Amino acid sequence: NKLVRRGFVQGMTHFSVGEEAANVGAVQHLSYDDIFFSNHRGHGQSIAQDMDLNKMMAELAGKATGVSKGRGGSMHLADFEKGNYGTNGIVGGSYALAVGAALTQQYKETGNIVVAFSGDGATNEGSFHESVNMAATWKLPVIFFIINNRYGISMDIRRATNTPHLYTRAEAYGIPGFYCEDGNDVMAVYDTMGKAVDHVRGGNGPAIVEVESYRWFGHSTADAGVYRTKEEVDEWKNNNDPIIRYRDYLVSENIASVEELDAIQSQV
């Protein structure tokens, strides 16, 4: 936010702060040979798949040293060597691209899978139906991963669809749908995504995954967030921070000590 206000970042920026568990838990199942596409809020997946942070920040600043040579900005990040085939500023724009990439993997018999990351709002775009239908018909190796953060810009998802859970749409296409109610628990997301990955890697066709999470900030840097109460946002920030929850998990399971985690935090 500070860099945006100072004019360092060029163009619109859409933060994924608060959705760290959803991003990391999903991407940990992907190798560099797998492929993923994402949306305007794709920084989280890009970081989780080891995008060079200096090059990412250079891209946000519009510099030629950026991952997209300074021409893509915040919404168009790509790192082909690590399977990141691009984030997309068009709502629902990644679906058809992912289906095409999945068709290539199937045709070449690579054994790799493709993931299309999106928010809840994009699932009401026509391209979602068209892409899932084609992927299901041809049994393509693609996962449609939905991060349901409850709001499509300012539209509450409960006012935008009569379907209480988006993953249930999978039934209409004859494919499995997987649901993670607690998308701020990175281990829960990892387990849910693992089931979908096993299904798709097994040559059984596509799957839909829905995880429920929450973005701390507005839809973009231009969004004042007046459609949400301060109490609602503070509840998520103070009591459901995915990073703090994972930190507590590591300590409670004796995987890492408080001192070790403090040292990592200071390095960051």
Provide a role label for each language-model segment:
Residues G44, R150-I153, R215-F217:
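Short gly/pro/ser/thr-enriched loop/turn and capping motifs at secondary-structure boundaries
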Residues F8-W138, D156-N162, Y167-G174:
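Cofactor-binding active-site loop characterized by glycine-rich and histidine/acidic residues
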